[in-house]
């Protein structure tokens, strides 16, 4: 396995497509490791700029993966090969991810791994409005920041999702990292409310309490 960040390792845990595409590939660590780990049979390292593709090509060649991984100069997912069944879009803001998704030719059954570094609510809202179901989520902590990873699939109908889930995750893995994230968010909003009275922040605290209550009820029923 090629050494990589904790964030990339967490993303790799949910890579399982036969043919994957890593959008904004940087050094192609995700797609190359997926091949080396026998999680995928082939893949594409994609970027809108030539520089990252040159870095990706170097990684591919150094690990003797030229028969399995190809580089593609693409604007998002436009022009992506039809054999791709899982697309990874991570390490960018939600607005850019949404822009990429909005320009793609999405079909039922196509799967995504998504991870934004800000505006999580906007991303989940877009997915909900466009029949992209969130199968599961997990929260990771890397270099002082929390990042959600969303495992998604395109469907032909809308997914039921609450406001609490839009804000703080759908089918989220309830581990210590996520619980620490909830504590961090709650303290942040309480600190804001101590200085200015804004109902929307009180509402978010209530959503966090709702999630904790649901988790407690699930543990009781086990």
For each feature predicted by the language model, list its residue ranges.
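S-adenosyl-L-methionine
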Residues: 1-18, 32-33, 54-82
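Conserved class I S-adenosyl-L-methionine
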Residues: 17-26
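Conserved SAM-binding loop of SAM-dependent methyltransferases across substrates and taxa
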Residues: 27-39
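Conserved SAM-binding motif I beta-strand of class I
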Residues: 42-47
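Conserved SAM/SAH-binding beta-strand->alpha-helix loop
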Residues: 49-51
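C-terminal substrate-binding/active-site "lid" region of AdoMet-derived donor-dependent transferases
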Residues: 102-151
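Conserved small/polar residues in nucleotide/adenosyl-binding loops
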Residues: 217-222
């Amino acid at each position: 396995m090629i050494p990589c960040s904790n964030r990339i390792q967490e993303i790799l845990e949910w890579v399982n497509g036969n043919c994957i595409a890593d959008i904004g590939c940087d050094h192609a660590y995700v797609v190359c490791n997926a091949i080396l780990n026998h999680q995928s049979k082939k893949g594409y390292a994609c970027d809108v700029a030539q520089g990252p593709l040159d870095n990706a090509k170097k990684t591919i060649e150094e690990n003797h993966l030229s028969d399995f991984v190809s580089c593609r100069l693409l604007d998002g997912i436009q022009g992506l090969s039809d054999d791709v069944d899982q697309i990874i879009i991570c390490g960018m803001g939600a607005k850019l991810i949404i822009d990429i998704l909005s320009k793609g030719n999405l079909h039922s059954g196509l799967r995504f791994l998504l991870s934004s570094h800000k505006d999580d609510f906007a991303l989940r809202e877009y997915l909900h409005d466009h029949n992209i179901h969130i199968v599961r989520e997990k929260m990771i902590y890397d270099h002082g920041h929390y990042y959600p990873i969303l495992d998604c699939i395109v469907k032909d109908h809308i997914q039921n999702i609450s406001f609490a889930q839009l804000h703080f995750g759908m089918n989220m893995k309830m581990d210590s990292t996520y619980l620490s994230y909830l504590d961090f968010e709650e303290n942040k909003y309480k600190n804001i409310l101590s200085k200015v009275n804004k109902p929307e922040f009180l509402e978010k605290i209530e959503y966090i309490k709702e999630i904790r209550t649901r988790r407690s009820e699930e543990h009781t029923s086990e």
